[in-house]
Amino acid sequence: MSLYATQDEKKQAAAKAALKHLPKGGILGVGTGSTVNFLIDLLPELQLEAAVASSQATADRLKKLGIEVVDMNHVGSLDAYVDGADEIDRHMHMIKGGGAALTREKIVASIAKKFVCIVDDSKWVDQLGRDFPLPVEVIPMARSAVARKLVSLGGDPVYREGVVTDNGNVILDVFNLNILNAIDLEKTINNIPGVVTNGIFALNPATIAIVATNDGIEERTAQ
């Protein structure tokens, strides 16, 4: 029997458990997505100096709670970055980008001293990419050319119709990739001309994962 009646209750529990890993009174990097939204609603407890948002949607939600949102260009580093994941494995490698904010998420995470990932256990996987397609942000004019390159890597790219990123680009969701070496594949895809970035977060993995399971909260680090 689960401690939680719904998946949303798991997400809320993970968000609450993450608070102790986040700085009080500092500047926090904040990700995007349904789990992060539960966390944002708790952030007033931390009395943050400010936040750097990874998307316009996150910025809007933070501002509604009275939390100042600052431009990343005015911040040298962040004490922590907190975000969810579409998938995460035992190496703390992740697939992100279901909400199409992967590029800004990756940029904000890159200046943080630690990356706190909050998920429910449905996102914990043995191998990335088996169940969730890999999002790739692409400059619009390069969509077809990039898609052909992704096919040559063994993937099955699908254009995410009707979605434009905050950066004005499009998303290709790549199915059936065999992600055995996440670091190498992240580099390979990012080197395709026209790719802005892809949703593998392996070069800059999570520091700790806060995982809500049926039995409660687990804190996991790389194995």
Swiss-Prot record:
It comes from the Bacteria. Its EC number is 5.3.1.6. The active site is at residue 105. Belongs to the ribose 5-phosphate isomerase family. InterPro entries: NagB/RpiA_transferase-like, Ribose5P_isomerase_typA_subgr, Ribose5P_isomerase_type_A. Catalyzes the reversible conversion of ribose-5-phosphate to ribulose 5-phosphate. Keywords: Isomerase. It holds the Pfam family Rib_5-P_isom_A. The lineage of its organism: Bacteria, Pseudomonadati, Pseudomonadota, Gammaproteobacteria, Moraxellales. It is an enzyme of class 5 (isomerase). The keyword Transmembrane does not apply. HAMAP family: Rib_5P_isom_A. Coiled coil: none annotated. The keyword Isomerase applies. This is Ribose-5-phosphate isomerase A. GO terms for molecular function: ribose-5-phosphate isomerase activity. One of its GO terms (biological process) is D-ribose metabolic process. It catalyses: aldehydo-D-ribose 5-phosphate = D-ribulose 5-phosphate. SUPFAM superfamilies: D-ribose-5-phosphate isomerase (RpiA), lid domain (SSF75445), NagB/RpiA/CoA transferase-like (SSF100950). One of its GO terms (cellular component) is cytosol.
